[in-house]
């Protein structure tokens, strides 16, 4: 019998309800006493049920019965084991999360391969509820599994990455139908692989819910595998992660041992340089003749990253209220994808013009005349510039650096900052779009940090690390405000001169 069935509670009709003081259940019939049937508490608050509906800003109750989610509990009020406490917390977090989804008219979580399977939560409380579900579910798994076996299985997760790369190389995702399924023999024939090889690869992916097997010997898409069909750039992002990042991470321990486990510097060997047998950094390798396809794939991968926040960034900061000459300088901004989004949303009121600087701006722009035309229409000018060199544009209203600093170790970041500060006027603003990692970092931020570290010697920084970085560059730099959004895992640091 399922846990849900074991702990299903009976409900009785009553015009009087109570609210559990521990927040386990929102509405419970009193049934003649004031004891909460979920937690056993006698301190429940009575309230008269009303037939009139009202609008509330708090999450609505889920449409399913609350009784179905009564937590595991001991009605005698004996101390609960930690395992049971975590289980109760998980059930409450799921209920809370469902309420937020319903309030924002978002679909319920599912593994079905719908293009819009997971909507974007706009309220931070909903994001926090979702994060709580994930964290508590992972904790339950860790507590449930044998610790020796759990550690061993965790140490073998790199095999999932290699299996995913094989599937992408074979374009398996393109041959599995969005609806319905395909047999292993049919799929093997379409991708040009031995059926036995394909079966073993798919077995590893299905463990992580990338594809599924509705019946033995058949495969179908899940929400995760369908993500590979939604955007060609997303495939390039996975390709980059499963190639350069994967290989760099495999040698990161060796690279750290060579520098005696200290913070990396620009000249230090990195996991990437050891994996690729070079003394050059990532950017230098991508500039070599013969590495054009790798460089193009990386550019497409970064375009996929940009798309995740492209519509969010213009709303994160009041660009229409910037002071001074109204000039925004997008330092290291590629060909202007983000700058165009900002100018398209805010040009005219405060923000008047934009210069996008990039080390390869001129060469790359010549190959994409449509991009040049789009920039021209929005008042975006391209300028060839290396951010380690003196900043040629003086006294601009805003110097905007997006996803720059996490690519570099501290000493290199100080150089970039010093060149920028030298050009700033007294009213100039330095806007840095990067992560400000919480002290208890999310899994995403933690893994991004290791990714930046092994590839570039870079890092994701918390607030105190950002403040130390600014002090090292110029004592006058201070954080005026940190702008955040629930819609994307990115942050905007507004930095000024005192």
Curated annotation (Swiss-Prot):
The active site is at residue 406. Pfam families: Dimerisation (PF08100), Methyltransf_2 (PF00891). InterPro entries: COMT-like (IPR016461), O_MeTrfase_dom (IPR001077), Plant_O-MeTrfase_dimerisation (IPR012967), SAM-dependent_MTases_sf (IPR029063), WH-like_DNA-bd_sf (IPR036388), WH_DNA-bd_sf (IPR036390). S-adenosyl-L-methionine binds at residue 358. Residues 1-19 have a biased composition (Polar residues). Induction: Expressed exclusively during fungal penetration of host leaves, the time point at which plant defense reactions are triggered. The keyword Secreted does not apply. Pathway: Secondary metabolite biosynthesis. Its EC number is 2.1.1.-. Residues 50-65 have a biased composition (Low complexity). Keywords: Methyltransferase, S-adenosyl-L-methionine, Transferase. One of its GO terms (biological process) is methylation. Gene3D superfamilies: Vaccinia Virus protein VP39 (3.40.50.150), Winged helix-like DNA-binding domain superfamily/Winged helix DNA-binding domain (1.10.10.10). GO terms for molecular function: O-methyltransferase activity; protein dimerization activity. PROSITE patterns: SAM_OMT_II. Residues 1-23, 42-83 are annotated as: Disordered. The keyword Mitochondrion does not apply. O-methyltransferase; part of the gene cluster that mediates the biosynthesis of a tyrosine-derived cytochalasan acting as a fungal signal recognized by resistant rice plants and leads to avirulence in Pi33 resistant rice cultivars. The first step in the pathway is catalyzed by the hybrid PKS-NRPS ACE1, assisted by the enoyl reductase RAP1, that are responsible for fusion of the tyrosine precursor and the polyketide backbone. Belongs to the class I-like SAM-binding methyltransferase superfamily. Cation-independent O-methyltransferase family. PANTHER family: O-METHYLTRANSFERASE ASQN-RELATED, PUTATIVE (AFU_ORTHOLOGUE AFUA_4G14580)-RELATED. This is O-methyltransferase OME1. The lineage of its organism: Eukaryota, Fungi, Dikarya, Ascomycota, Pezizomycotina. The gene is OME1.
